[in-house]
Amino acid sequence: MSLNLPNPSILGILLVVSTHSGPQLVFQYPPDLSNDSKKSSNLKRTNKTSTLQRKDSDSDELDIDDDDYIADNENDEEFVNADNDEEKEWDSRKMNYYLGTKSDLLSFLDEQEKFRQTSQERNKIYGHKQSDSHIDPDEIKSLHRNSKSGSSDKQIESPKLEASNSNNLKKTISSISDSQKSSTSKASTSGIPPVSPITSSTILGFEADYLCEMLCPPKQMCNSRFEIMIDDLVFLGLPIHSYDNGSWKSKHSHRPKSGKSSKGRSKNAADNASIDEGIDYETTSKSQSKNSMSMFHLVFIMNPPIIECNYRIDEMFHYVISRLSLVLRYEQSKHEYVWNQIRMIYNLKEEFRNQATMANLTKYLTDKSSLCKLISECFTQISRSNIANLSINNKLRSFQIPIKTEFHSLPDSTVPYLPGSHLSSTVNMLANTGLISVGETIRYDVNNLNSGGLDDFDDIDDNKSDSNADDIIYYALLLLDDPETIIRDIKAQQQSTLANFIRMIKPTESLLKLANKLKQQASDNGFSLDAGQIKSFAFHLIYWRRARVILPISTRSVYIVSPMAPITLKFHHDIFIFKKTFPALPSLPHFLKLLSNSSKPRQLATVIPSKDHRDAYLNALSWLIRYGYVTQLHTFIWLKISRKIKMKVEEDLENEGANNKRKKPSATADPNISNKLNAGTDNTSKTESNPEDIQRKMSQLRMINRNNNGNPTSYEQEIDNIEKKLLSPSIGLNLVLEDEGDTIIIDPGRASSLERRWINKVISEECNLSPELTVKFYELLKYMNGKNSLELLLLKENVSRQELRTLLFAIEDHIISVRHW
């Protein structure tokens, strides 16, 4: 597996509520959660492992699951092999599979294990004689009560269990099941709501009542992320609890803005802090409802791969669970939607109580209850990695886990990805908007696993996201399907504004150009859209996976065969489709050969035979970009400062410093010259380090030494050595080598004072730009950072290609250009 491949890992969804009657399971989907084959296989593996552990261990604490024990009094080898013989009787899908809660079952299995050991010892003495008496259910129940009330260290006296074969055990289970059924019938006659078949079955091997208690946390743990793992299953949700005043949203709560979250999933703000939307709820008498529901919890059951566990869990919580739960909380606060639906579900269960199967009950509930319907549709669509369009209180809401079909850099050769993925650096524009999910370039990124690869709601830099999102107006939209098919799939009206907008989208026109065209045609056809509406429609189409953001397709742009082209997977099939779609054009292999035939990439115009073929070639190019065969080649530039420029600027600074010193009174000589010499070289004092100054200072140092010591021999020799080193020509060479290389200005838009001097020197003396080009240079200077392509620069700054070509030719010796996707 890979993080680039969709893997929701969802097994089911539970709706649990807490009322005055306690925790209750309202609805589960799919209805046959107990029949999950993956869980059954995990339980079987756990059976064998736990059985072997019981055979070799004398510990009282056994790491076992609900179906670990099979009663048999044969030898150890026969006991280990008994799993296969008793699988049909011990079926986890049946009601009589469990004897009670999990703690009760563990206590019972402990007693059965003790009995098996004593039975084996007794068989050795008495010749393996067995009794035909049955296990008394009352004694088992008393054992359960004793195990609950007593301490774990206290020895519980074994009852008189003289038979442990499978037939007797099955009779015991059936008798207990009958007693449970009779107690249920008594409860229904006493006025307590009857337990429906959907709440009395086991869920993935666990008793429903046990799960309900576990999935209804205390109030202090609600309104924040809930996550618990049992065996290989993860129960994930966002429990919503009402406040003391009866409202479902704190009146004074707000979302504090914070910086980036710290490392680790445990420090994620969405996990530990209270999750609240930035919606101002009105605390009215209606919000302080008198219903008996104090909490509801929509729980997603997941079984992700171990190495992807953190990432898949965070992904599901971020994109689906948190957003869906908050929408339900909003509807509950405003209209009591959840509570009204739950009461309806209880009434529907009462009507359907005497019907045949659980599957029929689930279908009946999904047909009648909108809450059950949205839960079932959410599971169906999310498990298929589709978009879940849910109707919540007659309002359409969309939820999805974005598919990773956009890459800003080439993945490793061992990293799987979806065929037809798009490779372009322009995807970074929408990386922080949540509309797309950028693909991973390595198989398992440790940082992404720790943080989930996801930004929290509060972790997005708003300013950065807004500026990037605004740039979409300069891009074009490439529809990923036929316009009429998209209109039909999104269920838009044929003559609606959105439908007309979809029909007008062309990959050769930017959205800004489309907006200007609509303004001009508004007086004629009465159809107008401003830039804000166009951006909103574009974001919706991208989120619905109906469109892709690209730079407008042009014959003057350069296109190459994408390194991620699905040559080995879909090539033969796409050859037939391409020939059928564009019969007048060369075949798909020949078309790709035209784009990559030359050693140097060239413009698309050189490939088109004539103007009559222009539209056909542009349509074919759009088709190739849509299916990931072709990507555009972008040009990025940096501003380079040569060594010559830096030396000139340094000379100017030295001259300015010398002039400033002449204007000031001369400072007194420092007698501690030796301290300055030993302190190291100061680059700021290089202007004073000429040979005459060095000799003068050395003579002063000799005079000071003679006056102090009278024995100048050793000190004079040391001073002579220092003088030779300072006057040596190698010092000058070493000083030049420090600044011998060229410098690339990473961010010229935020250049320092020294870097601005370098840039001014390049423009004024080296390039001798005209006043017009100088003005244009400073307008485009911020884009010379290697992050913004020149193709986008032409669209944003309204610069003609001729002006840009003239400017780049004038500063050719002082720029570094790179071309990539």
UniProtKB/Swiss-Prot annotation:
<dbReference type="Pfam" id="PF24064">
    <property type="entry name" value="HTH_NPRL3"/>
</dbReference>
<feature type="region of interest" description="Disordered">
    <location>
        <begin position="654"/>
        <end position="694"/>
    </location>
</feature>
<dbReference type="InterPro" id="IPR005365">
    <property type="entry name" value="Npr3"/>
</dbReference>
<feature type="region of interest" description="Disordered">
    <location>
        <begin position="29"/>
        <end position="64"/>
    </location>
</feature>
<dbReference type="Pfam" id="PF03666">
    <property type="entry name" value="NPR3"/>
</dbReference>
<dbReference type="GO" id="GO:1990130">
    <property type="term" value="C:GATOR1 complex"/>
</dbReference>
<feature type="compositionally biased region" description="Polar residues">
    <location>
        <begin position="669"/>
        <end position="688"/>
    </location>
</feature>
<dbReference type="GO" id="GO:0051321">
    <property type="term" value="P:meiotic cell cycle"/>
</dbReference>
<feature type="signal peptide">
    <location>
        <begin position="1"/>
        <end position="21"/>
    </location>
</feature>
<comment type="function">
    <text>Mediates inactivation of the TORC1 complex in response to amino acid starvation. Required for meiotic nuclear division.</text>
</comment>
<feature type="compositionally biased region" description="Basic residues">
    <location>
        <begin position="249"/>
        <end position="266"/>
    </location>
</feature>
<feature type="region of interest" description="Disordered">
    <location>
        <begin position="246"/>
        <end position="283"/>
    </location>
</feature>
<keyword id="KW-0732">Signal</keyword>
<dbReference type="GO" id="GO:0034198">
    <property type="term" value="P:cellular response to amino acid starvation"/>
</dbReference>
<dbReference type="InterPro" id="IPR056603">
    <property type="entry name" value="HTH_NPRL3"/>
</dbReference>
<dbReference type="GO" id="GO:0038202">
    <property type="term" value="P:TORC1 signaling"/>
</dbReference>
<dbReference type="GO" id="GO:0010508">
    <property type="term" value="P:positive regulation of autophagy"/>
</dbReference>
<feature type="compositionally biased region" description="Basic and acidic residues">
    <location>
        <begin position="116"/>
        <end position="142"/>
    </location>
</feature>
<feature type="region of interest" description="Disordered">
    <location>
        <begin position="116"/>
        <end position="194"/>
    </location>
</feature>
<keyword id="KW-0469">Meiosis</keyword>
<protein>
    <recommendedName>
        <fullName>Nitrogen permease regulator 3</fullName>
    </recommendedName>
</protein>
<dbReference type="GO" id="GO:1904262">
    <property type="term" value="P:negative regulation of TORC1 signaling"/>
</dbReference>
<comment type="similarity">
    <text>Belongs to the NPR3 family.</text>
</comment>
<feature type="compositionally biased region" description="Low complexity">
    <location>
        <begin position="170"/>
        <end position="192"/>
    </location>
</feature>
